[in-house]
């Protein structure tokens, strides 16, 4: 019988530690295994938010035996996001502000209504503003007796999570899953043919979700190809800037595709809640008073679309940096057998790039891509950031 922790890929030590904590929490014994605040870190695709959600399910599990059965009502509702005592915070904008955090703290102060614990799971805790982080810190320092905080962030670097907040949490570091582990999941859980699973796993950068998308979504494969075409376009400066514009446009199209259906559904639901189409007494005044609510929805949807577009663009930049990294590794005599290439299916392109660009140029190219990612984090307009990166790539190639 599959338990919730079966969703983790290549994280055996994490599963053991979280299971021990859930057992201690259930038994109610004083133990160093359980605490009120946890910080899950790991690179994109490592499954840090999945691990946190699985732990939340294990804490709420009502079945006998090892917590996290995956079958009881508490486990299934937690994993589905419908458990009344598990609050999952997924930032839709570029940051988590003070107002939202105060609302979360109010929820955290309540006693659980149906479950064993009141669990607050904050994904992308690195998006907390400084003020919002301080609001959270106050309750983390003195947590309610039956409340558990689960924070997720890329790393323990002070730029990702405040030092003080980090010091109040038990740290759970996740590792990048191996290509073999990802391929096995795609074969056994998704029923993919071995060749398809192994290819998707090898080019996913250790990201399980991305491997699944690349294997099943033609548009995802097209976006990857389009992003990597920028590297060859750099040899022709006029084409390079056009390729950079295509990169931004592709990210915007992906965001629109992801958001459009949800945005329309939210608008319809809000219109219904506000009495759209009503003819009864008070309908006209209700419609007049809805302008502010509609404007707030539009603001949140715009912020969510911006974040989705930035995330899509960042994934493309990681692919571009990976191709330069592969060429640099090859230039220094490394082969795919000693170091895992990011793009093993592009061996000819990697070889050509290594032959055409000196090591210094490859290194400067990687730095240009990383500088672009940092600029996007600082809210520089994507087209400006990409144009500056392309200029840096052209200069690096000519060096």
Predicted regions and their residues:
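Solvent-exposed, charged/polar functional surfaces in cytosolic regulatory/catalytic domains
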Residues: 107, 323, 368
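Walker B beta-strand of ABC/ABC-like P-loop ATPase nucleotide-binding domains
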Residues: 121, 150-151
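Conserved phosphate-interacting/catalytic interface
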Residues: 320
């Amino acid at each position: 019988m599959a338990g919730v922790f079966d969703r983790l890929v290549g994280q055996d030590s994490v599963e053991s530690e979280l299971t021990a904590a859930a057992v201690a929490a259930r038994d109610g014994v004083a133990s160093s295994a359980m605490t009120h605040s946890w910080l899950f870190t790991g690179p994109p695709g490592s499954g840090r938010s999945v691990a946190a959600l699985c732990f939340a399910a294990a804490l709420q599990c009502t079945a006998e035996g090892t917590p996290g059965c995956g079958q009881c009502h508490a486990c299934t509702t937690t994993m589905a996001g419908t458990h009344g005592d598990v609050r999952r915070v997924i930032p839709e904008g570029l940051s988590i502000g003070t107002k939202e955090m105060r609302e979360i703290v109010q929820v955290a102060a309540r006693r659980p209504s149906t479950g064993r614990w009141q669990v607050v799971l904050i994904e992308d805790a690195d998006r907390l503003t400084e003020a919002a982080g301080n609001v959270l810190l106050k309750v983390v320092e003195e947590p309610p007796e039956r409340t558990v905080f689960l924070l997720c962030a890329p790393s323990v670097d002070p730029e990702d999570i405040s030092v003080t907040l980090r010091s109040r949490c038990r740290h759970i570091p996740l590792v990048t899953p191996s290509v073999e582990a990802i391929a096995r999941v795609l074969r056994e859980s998704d029923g993919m043919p071995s060749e398809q699973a192994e290819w998707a796993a090898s080019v996913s950068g250790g990201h399980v979700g991305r491997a699944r998308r690349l294997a099943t979504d033609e548009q995802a494969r097209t976006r990857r190809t389009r992003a990597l075409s920028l590297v060859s376009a750099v040899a022709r400066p006029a084409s390079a800037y056009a390729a950079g514009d295509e990169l931004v446009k592709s990210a915007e199209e992906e965001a629109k595709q992801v958001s459009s259906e949800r945005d329309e559904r939210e608008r319809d639901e809000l219109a219904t809640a506000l009495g759209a189409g009503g003819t009864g007494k008070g309908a006209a005044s209700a419609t007049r008073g809805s302008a502010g609510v509609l404007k707030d929805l539009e603001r949140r949807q715009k912020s969510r679309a911006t974040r989705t577009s930035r995330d899509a663009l960042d994934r493309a930049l990681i692919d571009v940096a990976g191709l330069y990294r592969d060429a640099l590794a090859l230039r220094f005599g490394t082969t795919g057998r000693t170091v895992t290439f990011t793009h093993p299916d592009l061996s000819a392109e990697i070889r050509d790039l290594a032959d055409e660009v000196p090591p210094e140029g490859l290194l400067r190219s990687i730095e240009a891509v990383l500088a672009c990612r940092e600029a996007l984090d600082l809210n520089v307009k994507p087209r400006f950031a990409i144009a500056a990166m392309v200029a840096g790539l052209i200069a690096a190639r000519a060096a």
